Amino acid sequence: MLEKYIDEVARTTGNTFMTENKVPPHLTVAAIEARSVKELRQPFLDMAKGLKAGSISLVSTGQLLPYVFYVTPVLNEYLTELSNKVYCAFKDLPDAEISKYYRPGNWLPHVTIGKKLSEEQMKQAFEVMYKRFQPLEAEIVEIGLSKVNPHEDGLIDNV
């Protein structure tokens, strides 16, 4: 269903950033700036071993102005624990910095369905999702470590 929302926003707005860059539906748990991706590999693998799948309820849409349109889950116990585990896995790395917007207790979980939208495209995305969006239950079954802009999957592990 999330892929359909991404496709619908792209089709309606003409903004194909998400589809052209093959950005899959995902919930970003942390944004880490690191000197080298290699230093993130082992902490990621160690952390991923202890994770389990979990359920989320995607209940609303929103905007991170000026460019991002998203659907958002209820922040439940599973997501809170996931955020804490990811933060703890990377917080002490000397050459890595976790964004202040993705730390436990200071995080807006969301699934981006439109990115790099103009003001007019944002309005179009809102209009189409106002008509189409239906709350849904989803299962978190994988965790990945990816580069962004453009999107590039690095490591993916089942949870």
Regions found by a protein language model. Give the residues of each.
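Short, flexible active-site-adjacent loop segments at beta-strand->alpha-helix junctions, enriched
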Residues: 33, 62, 67, 75, ...
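Hydrophobic, well-structured mid-protein blocks that either form specific transmembrane helices
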Residues: 49, 53-65, 69-74
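Basic, often amphipathic N-terminal segments
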Residues: 1-55, 78-137, 152-159
